[in-house]
A protein has these predicted regions:
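Transmembrane-helix boundary and interhelical linker motifs in polytopic inner-membrane proteins
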Residues: 1-16, 77-80
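Helix-loop interface residues and adjacent transmembrane-helix termini in multi-pass membrane transporters
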Residues: 3, 75-76, 80, 106-109, ...
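Alpha-helical transmembrane segments of multi-pass membrane transport and lipid-handling proteins
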Residues: 12-38
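Alpha-helical transmembrane segments of multi-pass membrane proteins
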Residues: 30, 43-69
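Helix-terminus/linker motif at the lipid-water interface of multi-pass membrane proteins
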Residues: 36-43, 101-110, 170-187
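Membrane-interface junctions at transmembrane-helix termini in multi-pass inner-membrane proteins
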Residues: 62-86
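Membrane-interface helix-loop junctions in multi-pass transport and translocation proteins
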Residues: 80, 90-128
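Interhelical loop/hinge segments that connect adjacent transmembrane helices in multipass membrane
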Residues: 112, 116-119, 131-172
Length: 187
């Protein structure tokens, strides 16, 4: 029943999400060419891998911003809300992959890069759904979520819990992206 602290924790999570996204974008721009050069890919595959990863990194900000909002909905409204939202992600992503990989329904035909674009758009759609639910659900009205509150203590707590969890999630999620790059040299 500590509703006063919820806004501070959510704001801290959103701030950290933005900081992490900026770090990942910088890392991408400084290191992606070196990482891909190690793999000795064919020029076409190199190009696709580079821009596929860029699309994922850009989309990741939507995913990162979703994490604190998901925690909020899980805490206040129960886990069924976020479960339903994430179940929507699969058909949305499949449809967007179909559109952007093959150029259907007016989308540009992007091939492998289209898969990254589709995933990025899916992350932002999920973010939009979470924001819409939080704004329109009466359970969230009394939490003062739009009164910005910053707390260094809250950020330290986030990092203490979040770094180990985040490393695990990052390793799991990036594994799939890197597997695609590694097997690409086999055709």
């Amino acid at each position: 029943n500590e509703k006063d602290g919820i806004a501070t924790v959510i704001h801290s999570g959103l701030i950290l999400s933005i900081i992490i996204e900026l770090i990942l974008l910088l890392a991408y721009f400084f290191f992606i060419d070196d990482i891909l050069a190690i793999l000795t890919l064919e020029p076409d595959v190199y190009y696709i891998a580079k821009y596929y990863m860029l699309a994922l990194i850009i989309g990741l900000s939507g995913g990162l911003l979703t994490f604190p909002l998901r925690s909020l909905t899980d805490t206040v409204a129960g886990t069924a809300v976020s479960m339903k939202i994430y179940l929507l992600a699969l058909p949305i992503n499949a449809f967007l992959n179909y559109c952007f990989i093959y150029g259907n329904f007016g989308a540009p035909k992007l091939g492998g890069i289209g898969a990254g674009v589709a995933t990025a758009i899916t992350y932002y759609i999920l973010l939009f759904i979470f924001i819409t639910i939080i704004i329109n659900n009466p359970q969230f009205k009394n939490l003062a979520l739009f009164n910005f509150k910053f707390s260094l203590k809250s950020i330290k707590e986030y990092l203490g819990i979040g770094i180990p969890n985040g490393m695990g999630i990052f390793m799991e999620a990036s594994l799939f992206g890197f597997i695609i790059i590694f097997i690409s040299k086999f055709g």
